[in-house]
UniProtKB/Swiss-Prot annotation:
Residues 1-29, 344-478 are annotated as: Disordered. Gene3D superfamilies: Rhodanese-like domain (3.40.250.10). This is Protein THYLAKOID RHODANESE-LIKE, chloroplastic. It is a multi-pass membrane protein. The gene is TROL.
Length: 478
């Protein structure tokens, strides 16, 4: 050990070995190239991580001795020279690169290539990844921008339940993932989360099925970050196995299952159910609905017609005209008819009491006239029966009222003496028959009423047998 110490501390040869043969001093440029080569080899060995053991091997005793001798300040008698690092200047590096360009390029590539590969193959942090269930729950509680997305099918979520995020004052967004409809999935997410650049999503699946794939998909479409829960909801190290808060499934009917989590997509079934319920309610309570509608119409009419002065005057005038011109006349006519029917007897009941009252008066005045007028009470029955029959058409010609269609001849004028005699006879007859005036017309009205005449045909042919008129006589020969 003492000999070794003397060798390291002094450049003089040991007495056990022969002194080295004197060599010519190498040029300074050659020494610098050697030093640059040694340093470059050491750098390449460090960069490659020990791939080239020969370049990174330690210096031997002779090489160390030679370097210490070269770095000494004089010839062989120089004493007290210490080992110093090689002085590599900028000029020496430039000279080496100029003389050995291939070696310099290889050295630079060997140093830069590992750094480039580290950046490309995963040196930078990715915005998506896989985390444990406990870490995911902690992120949901601590980070305001973290949201839980449940991508399980709706049937699995209803059967097993969902995570309970009441501690974080949040709610899991149930958005089922379908690998064949990625655009629809992203659209549903955009409806739920309006600020994707500041939103971190925690993806929960039943197991590790599609959670990591969805995390990569959402980060590629503008979300800040996304992390898949390890083993999902029901895995060995998933959410349930980690004893994290969990909401048990609901056994009864729930409107939230029909409506869903999104407020923008109301299912069609809920709309149909609401329409059906409203229809049944309106059908069963139709009277109440009509009353309500009528009340609403009256309120609207009063509000629109009576608020302003001009509308109020016009409305009151219309109401007055309605009651005076449309409603009142009809009611007045109906009331007059009812009063007339109550006070005035009918036609059939009016004739019979008049006959019964007139019969005693005629019996007291003239017994002979009473016997003559005993039969007339049956006459009104005949009149009522004839009135009930349909009316015959009245002929237009007066000749039908005469037998054989022959009117009577005009009377010849009488002498003045005969005229005065006839007038006196008529006056005496009128005075004699005065007491029976009240009863005689009623008795004589029935026999004088002639039956209605048959309608007169417009053609003369019905007057001939077999509708054949007689032939015209042929003229005789002269």
């Amino acid at each position: 050990m003492a000999a070794t110490t003397t060798i390291l501390s002094s450049a003089a040869p040991t007495p056990l070995t022969a002194p080295p043969r004197a060599r010519a001093r190498a040029p300074a440029a050659r020494r610098r190239r050697l030093r640059a080569r040694d340093i470059l080899g050491a750098a390449l060995g460090l960069a490659n991580g020990g791939a080239s053991a020969a370049l990174a091997a330690p210096l031997s005793y002779e090489e160390t001795l030679r370097l210490s001798t070269d770095s000494g300040g004089g010839g062989g008698g120089g004493g007290g020279g210490e080992f110093a690092l090689p002085d590599l200047g900028l000029g020496g590096v430039l000279d080496f690169v100029a003389q050995n360009p291939l070696a310099a390029a290889a050295g630079v590539a060997a140093v830069a290539l590992p750094l480039v590969l580290a950046q490309v193959l995963g040196g930078a942090s990715k915005p998506y990844g896989v985390v444990s269930a406990a870490a995911a729950y902690r992120a949901l509680v601590e980070e305001p921008g973290a949201q839980l997305v449940d991508i399980r099918p709706p049937g699995d979520a209803r059967q097993s339940g969902a995570p309970d995020l009441r501690e974080a004052k949040k709610k899991a967004a149930a958005v089922p993932y379908d690998g064949e409809d990625k655009n629809g999935f992203l659209k549903k997410l955009s409806l739920r989360f309006k600020d994707p650049e500041n939103t971190t999503l925690v993806i929960l699946d039943k197991f590790d099925g599609n959670s990591e794939l969805v995390a990569e998909l959402v980060t590629a479409n503008g979300y800040k970050a996304a992390f898949a829960v390890k083993d999902g909801a029901e895995g060995r190290r998933g959410w349930l196995s980690s004893s994290l808060p969990w909401t048990a499934p609901k056994k009864g009917f729930s409107l939230s299952d029909l409506i869903g989590d999104g407020t923008d997509g109301l299912p069609v079934t809920l709309g149909l159910a609401a329409a059906t319920g409203l229809g049944i309610l309106a059908y069963t309570e139709i009277e109440t609905v009509l009353q309500f509608l009528g009340s609403a119409a009256i309120v609207q009419l009063v509000a629109s017609k009576l608020i302003y002065a001009e509308d109020r005057k016009r409305t009151l005038k219309q109401i007055d005209d309605f009651f005076n011109k449309k409603v009142a006349p009809k009611e007045l006519v109906d009331e007059i008819k009812e009063i007339g029917q109550a006070l005035l007897p009918s036609t059939g009941t009016k004739s019979q009491p008049a006959i019964t009252e007139a019969a005693p008066a005629t019996a007291e005045a003239a017994p002979a006239a009473a016997t003559a007028t005993a039969a007339p009470p049956a006459a009104p029955v005949e009149e009522t029966s004839t009135e009930a029959a349909p009316a015959e058409p009245t002929p237009l010609s007066p000749y039908t009222n005469y037998p054989d269609l022959k009117p009577p001849s005009s009377p010849s004028p009488l002498a003045p003496a005969e005229a005065t005699k006839n007038e006196s006879e008529s006056e005496s007859a009128a005075t004699e028959s005065a007491p029976a005036v009240n009863s005689a017309p009623v008795a004589e009205a029935a026999p004088e009423a002639a039956p209605p005449a048959a309608p007169r045909p417009l053609s003369p042919y019905p007057n001939y047998p077999d509708l054949k008129p007689p032939s015209s006589p042929s003229p005789s020969a002269p």
